[in-house]
Amino acid sequence: MHRGGDRSTDPSSGPAPGSRGGGDGRFGRGPSRWSSGGGGGGSGSPPHRFSRGGGGGGGDGGGGGGGGGRFHPYRGPSDHSGGGGYRSGGGGEYGEPGSGPRHRYGSGRGDHSDHDNRNNYVKLFIGSVPRTATEDDVRPLFEEHGDVVEVALIKDRKTGEQQGCCFVKYATSEEAERAIRALHNQYTLPGAMGPIQVRYADGERERHGAIEHKLFVASLNKQATAKEIEEIFAPYGHVEDVYIMKDGMRQSRGCGFVKFSSREPALAAMSALSGNYVMRGCEQPLIIRFADPKRPRPGESRGGPAFGGPGFSPRSDAALVIRPTANLDEPRGRHMPPDSWHPSSPRSAPHQFNNFGSDNPMAPKGSTVTSTTDTATFRPQMFSGNGSLSSQTAVPSSSHMGMNPPPMAQGHHLGGQQIPPLQKLPGLPQNFPVQLQNNQLGQPLQGPAQQIGQLQVPQSMGPGSFGQNRLSGQLPVSQPLMQQNASVSAVQVPSAVSNSMQAIPGQQHLPSNVAPQMLQQPVQQMPSQAPQLLLQQQAALQSSYQSSQQAIYQLQQQLQLMQQQQQSNLNHQQPTQGQPVQSSNPGAPNAIIPSNINTIPQQATSPAVPLTCNWTEHTSPEGFKYYYNSITRESKWDKPEEYVLYEQQQQQQQQQKLLLLQQHQQKLAMQQLQSPPQAQTHPAMQPVQQIPQAQQGQQQMQMKQQELNYTQLQTPGAIDPSRIQQGIQSAQERAWKS
């Protein structure tokens, strides 16, 4: 297709004076977006489509070269002199050839091809450009530092709105470097929220032979400034630039780039700080890698979206760092090993960090960025580098069980050796003693089949068994491992319990390869079973508490009957003298209280008024009740008021006793839930206070017998709850007989 003479006038006549297309015009446009100028018409072949400049004139004799291009204040007159086809026009004026379409930015370059020109220009990426900015706002700023070939504002293909960034092309790399040094983070365009970012576009620096020594730094404090970051890296060499990556709200993403003047200080800073230095306000050390430039993927051309072609969207800049920084900013332990960031393969890091390099400020819209945090950075230690499942997978990760995770670096030193399951869970024994203690508090007197630790070995496992009947079978197998692991020594199981478990057929001789498989699910189920165990123990304690309350109430009724009988017997046996006779055994009710309530203080049970009355109640041979006064020897059929008050006082006393008993039972139940069983035996061994001297000897004998019964709980031999119950019953019977 011929484009050279589409808009040209007659070749022989030349351009009209003052016309934009002639040699006298100052401004012109090229045939395409990337080139300008065009060859003249005439008898020769049509000019090259992408040629710059070209000979004007017509016919067989070509005139002077028509270079063209707009004037800018940076270049001197020598750059625009005529001749040679470089910015030359007829008569030495700044114009373009008389024929050929006009280029938008008009940079005549003689007869060079487009391929050569593509290798000469340098493309810069400009960030933080206002969405309302135009080319006239951007171009003058950059023309102060060199010859601007083109300014391309990036717009959305669907909406047509600007994306807040643009590309600027310079003719030489020196001009581009000059613009970067003068404008990067130093100039704010009108209407912008912050200074513009000026840096090389994708692959431009490498294409021109310049190498940038830039580090990608993660785990930065989001409140840190560029100055604070520079102070961290300054001791290792001259820091040329610090760039903090920010989101759409201008908030730091916790990562950025630090540029050094040479490779040696950059390497020294990375070796000294990566994995070792923790910034103030952060929980994990810095993660530092070289910010290698992005390399084109196979099948991806430089004109594609990643290199500023059609379909490019700067919004994907936000997608570049959101995923890695979201993973990096999450706390994963107080100390992270230095090698936790190493990728699975030595060459994977450059490709994964290329998206953050200096030469890739943005990526195509909707592009997927693969970061090392997804594959290798925080890869569970049970996986090897090649993604295969290693031998460490027998036990699930401790982070799923609510325990303190082991150091991540252990996975690198384990290799392929087989590790015992209990050694790989150092946090596991922290849960075992709690469950043992809680289980030891639950119902030690219900039957001989249950033992103190609720480790019910016979057939069906109780609620206190580990892992619901599966982990209990592993205890005999893993018993040598428990002895080897120092952290498991907190689990103190009586020898009778362990011996009885070893004696069970079918559970002792389990194959060794079954143990890891059976340990997987029970260990994960233990935290969820703890509340169920506590609820079951609480229900059992409540039932035992209710039964004890009923027994106490029956004892109180019997106590009242015995008091009345004793009082009546004393009244019948009294001598007939005139002196007042009082009850000779006021402390008898306290002496007959069973041993399980012997810790109630005497002061709380004694009423304010002495429980004495001269009237007693009797029954006549006919079956009628009458009342007799032992002092006046008076008998009445009606109940005397003095006797009515006496009965009320007795009722109040009984109510107070019942309340105190209930409170005491509740306290004991709470202590059983919170303290080990050894501490439970002490309340039962406390002696009764303020007992009459006549009964102290007998009470001491009862307490000694109780001590003998309860000390059997602490012996490592076989424990029979029926013996404990028999001891309590015998103590109660002796108390009644006294």
Swiss-Prot record:
Compositional bias of kind Polar residues = 342-358, 383-401, 575-594, 723-732
Tissue-wise, where is it found?
Mostly expressed in young flowers (panicles) and stems, and also present in young seedlings leaves and roots.
Q: What does this protein do?
A: Plays a major role in the promotion of the transition of the vegetative meristem to reproductive development. Required for RNA-mediated chromatin silencing of a range of loci in the genome. Cotranscriptionally recognizes aberrant RNA and marks it for silencing. Controls alternative cleavage and polyadenylation on pre-mRNAs and antisense RNAs. Regulates flowering time, seed size and cell volume, probably via the modulation of cell size.
Q: Give the matching InterPro entries.
A: Hud_Sxl_RNA, Nucleotide-bd_a/b_plait_sf, RBD_domain_sf, RRM_dom, WW_dom, WW_dom_sf
Identify the stretch(es) annotated as Disordered.
Answer: 1-118, 292-414, 566-594, 670-738
Carries keyword Iron? no
Matching Pfam families, A to Z?
A: RRM_1, WW
Feature: compositional bias, Basic and acidic residues = 109-118
Name of the molecule in the record: Flowering time control protein FCA
Quote the biased-composition stretches of kind Low complexity, using this chain's numbering: 368-377, 683-706
Complexes and interactors = Interacts with FY. Binds to SF1, FIK, RPRD1B, Os09g0509000/LOC_Os09g33480 and MADS8.
Top-level taxonomic group:
Eukaryota
Ordered alphabetically, the record's keywords are: Developmental protein, Differentiation, Flowering, Nucleus, Repeat, RNA-binding
User: Do the record's keywords include DNA repair?
Assistant: no
The protein's predominant localisation is: nucleus
Location(s), subcellular: Nucleus
Q: Could you state a single Gene Ontology molecular function term? A: RNA binding
Gene Ontology terms, cellular component aspect? nucleus; spliceosomal complex
Taking every annotated instance into account, which residue ranges of this chain make up the domain RRM? 122-203, 213-293
What is one process in the GO biological process aspect for this record?
A: flower development
Domain WW per the UniProt entry, residue ranges: 609-642
Q: Where is the composition biased (Gly residues)?
A: 52-70, 81-98, 301-311
